[in-house]
Amino acid sequence: MSAETLAARPSPLSRRGRLLLGLLLAAAAAWATLGLAPSDALPGEAGRGILRLFLEGALSPALTYEGSDVPADAPPLLARVAGALWRTVVFAVAGLSLSLVIGVVLGFLGARSWWEDDERECAVRARARAPVRRVLAAVHLSVRVTIALMRSVHELLWAVLLLAALGLTSFSAVIAIAIPYGGTLAKVFSEMLDECPRDTVRSLRAIGARGVSVFAWGLLPRAMGDMSAYAFYRFECAVRSSAILGFFGYPTIGYYLRLSAENVHYREVWTYLYALLALVGLLELWSSRLRRRVVMR
Amino acid sequence: MSERLRRLHRARPRSRFVRASAAVGGLCTAYVWCSGAVEAGDFLSARRRENLVRFLTEDSVPFPLRGEGFDLAGAWSWAGEVLGGRGLQAAVATVAIATVAIALAGVLSGCLAPLAAATVATERPVEPAAGGGRPAWRALRLIVRAGMIVMRSIPEYVLAFLLLAVLGPNHAWPAVLALALHNGAILGRLGAEAVENLEPGPLRSLRGLGASRRSILAAGVFPLALGNYLLYFFYRFETCVREATVLGMLGVVSLGFYIQDARAKLYYDEMLLLIGLGSVIVLAADWVSSRARRYLRSGV
């Protein structure tokens, strides 16, 4: 970088400074809007009692039911925890596998490199005539809009919608995860495809490859590592989402956690929390080992 | 030629672990879909279809448009009333919750990140041999990292639910604190990585000049790591807005509160309208955060 370009640019510190100042002002305004009182952030008399109970529960998570009003046919607590954990994973696996299909299809169709035909890209639009190109551009735009809309509604809100439309069925939980996750995967996949190095693409084009084959052999293998690492990371998120779907009546871990908390059985709450933490921790370990092997640096 | 290709193919990098992971993933997926654990067929049953048709053709249609009295002006004023009244108020509250939460998360992660970074939290910071350190330093890093793992593994929704029982429902703190703790832990981890990946040269020269740990942090680590950190920060802001919307369903007054309210009253038309409003807010936050990131990178 030469001296002129350095002088022509404003210093990066001032840019950050402006952003931070804006952020501070926004936070102050938001604080005032919400009317937050710092004293309310600490528990009151009753809250302290609950907090004490809750923290005591952390040291001695329940291994059997805490209450005495357990129905005779209820499974042992640990079996119930294992079942809830298993169903949490089942919903997450089903939701993520569906969203992977959506993510790959929409991610390809949403990637600029799938459509455009300037020098660096592999073109599907390249050989089409002008009116066809306009139609294809419209398809590209509508795919991107669809991705944004799928992503912009939280999985819990999709669940609420699907509960109203379909009622309580495990398939509605799966779709509630699959739609927003499909959108997120599609967005990230298309960005990864557009941003991955173009060297292979260039050499393939130089030896005469065109169109989809450049995409499939030049671009996809370069982005594949990042894409699979990200997909696995999303699985971890899907497990968390699946867990909280239980708050809406699905039989995942959130359902039992909520029941126990509402009955003030905090030792049982901790059993569920520890189970969820162990599962997520295990997945995180797995995901980081996988990332080290598949992500190209 | 083909012999050479075959040899290259055989010599490609492979990993047993990756293959085993893919196999486990594939088997689990096949099992989940084939075993009947997910009732995909039930989706097509007559009762569900009926429910779906009723939802689409009656429940979700704005009520002034239902049946005989097709009243477009009425629908318009109904939408204006819902969106302009509680909709607007809840939208402002949602964004405000997310903003306060992300600011607190920023402060929290600023405290945690240096404590978790192996290059700083050690008795001889930023020196070439840094990284190990006495057991006390190692224990400190381990505790901070473990705490962050726990905080980011518990979903915000569960955190807010538990905080609601402790703090009471009459203010926004349960939602704000849940988001701040969860995101503070995530940003703390990312910040610690940003600190560890810093170019060691400038920091070592500060150390060579005799700077203390605190001055190295203030004059070297924070300014240098801030750029990368802020990129993550604005990315998390978007997620915060998304989550702030739904935390309302627990009883804090954000958009989710009114969505839950409409749902409980079976006003599905109003519920859809509010969900649409939530979608607009999230898209707006997405736009703001991507603009902020672009501004950081290139100044536009």
Regions found by a protein language model. Name each.
Chain B
Residues 231, 272-300:
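C-terminal transmembrane helix and the adjacent membrane-cytosol boundary/short C-terminal tail
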Residues 80, 84, 88, 92, ...:
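Alpha-helical membrane-protein architecture signal
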Residues 12-16, 86, 90, 94-102, ...:
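Loop-to-transmembrane-helix entry motif
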Residues 162-165, 169-221, 227-236, 287-290:
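Membrane-cytosol interface at the C-terminal ends of specific transmembrane alpha-helices
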Residues 128-180:
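Generic hydrophobic transmembrane alpha-helix motif, especially the helices
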Residues 114, 161-165, 232, 244-248, ...:
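Transmembrane alpha-helix boundary and packing residues in multipass membrane permease domains
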Residues 1-103, 107, 111, 115-142, ...:
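N-terminal, non-cleaved signal-anchor transmembrane helix
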